[in-house]
């Protein structure tokens, strides 16, 4: 239940909240006349490759709005406070990338063209708040690596400058997720930890499938897609060890894991608080990705009614 005067710990999450408040920016701060530095064909390829990241910003915005009251009910006041600034960040990224698509003169892929995006989105909303934070950390590592490429390669171009701004926000998101998971993982069962490891492998498998669809686009912009995925996998495994996932595994499960391409999902916690989207209404428009998600039978069966 929501408390009138909850316990309020001045921990890292509160400090991250303060940093987020001071670091706010908007589309009005962006010079949209900055050069693109892409040919028309490269702009189209970038628009396609950016699609999973773009949808991820929207998905994170919705997921945070569902998780926030769960944290309030659990008495996690500082996490609740931080997540409020996280919501603002994700909303800003969504708006900025929408404007970028207009500047590129291109549109993102549709769910029909890349159905793996819907699988990824649905996996993040399955389970409880611990599942969600772990999924967000994995997604943020992907986004960080993607944005870093362009922040370094095109520091004076429009997308390079946008990437630099977004990376500063993403660094806070990763710090939040890492702190929250480090604090939570020692309190869960070995079976629960194995489920989180399985979730990691499943999300990496979905990313692999998305890469197969975007291979030609990566080639068009000169991106080493295979090298990108290999570095991503290494970074995620490093983070998994840092937050204590491997240390918390039962002895029989401490061997190295491999990426699974199966679409099956690990079981969530025994009594999870599901990230229900029951409060959302099916969209009647067709102008955003969330509308496309809402119009799919799979999403409607997932309580989006």
What is the predicted role of each segment?
Residues 1-289:
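Non-heme di-metal
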């Amino acid at each position: 239940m929501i408390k009138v005067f909850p316990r309020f710990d001045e921990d890292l999450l509160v400090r991250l909240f303060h940093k987020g408040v001071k670091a706010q920016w908007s589309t009005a701060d962006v010079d949209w006349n900055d050069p693109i530095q892409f040919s028309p064909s490269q702009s189209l390829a970038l628009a396609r490759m950016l699609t999973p990241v773009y949808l991820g910003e929207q998905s994170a915005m919705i997921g945070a709005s569902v998780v926030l009251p769960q944290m309030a009910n659990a008495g996690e006041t500082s996490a609740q406070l931080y997540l409020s600034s996280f919501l603002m960040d994700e909303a800003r990224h969504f708006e900025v990338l929408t404007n970028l698509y207009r500047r590129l003169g291109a549109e993102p892929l549709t769910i029909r063209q890349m159905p793996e995006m819907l699988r990824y989105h649905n996996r993040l909303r399955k389970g409880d708040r611990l599942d969600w934070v772990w999924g967000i950390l994995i997604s943020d590592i992907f986004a960080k690596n993607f944005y870093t490429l362009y922040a370094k390669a095109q520091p004076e171009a429009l997308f390079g400058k946008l990437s630099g701004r977004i990376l500063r926000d993403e660094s806070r998101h990763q710090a939040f997720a890492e702190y929250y998971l480090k604090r939570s993982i020692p309190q869960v069962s070995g079976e629960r930890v194995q489920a989180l490891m399985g979730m990691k492998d499943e999300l990496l498998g979905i990313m692999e499938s998305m890469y197969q669809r975007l291979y030609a686009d990566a080639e068009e912009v000169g991106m080493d897609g295979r090298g990108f995925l290999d570095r991503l996998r290494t970074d995620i495994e490093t983070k998994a060890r840092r937050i204590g996932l491997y240390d918390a595994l039962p002895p029989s499960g401490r061997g190295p894991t491999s990426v699974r391409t199966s679409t099956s999902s690990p079981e969530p916690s025994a009594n999870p608080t599901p990230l229900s989207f029951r409060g959302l209404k099916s969209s009647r428009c067709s102008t955003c990705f969330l509308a496309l998600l809402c119009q799919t039978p799979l999403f409607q069966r997932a309580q989006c009614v």
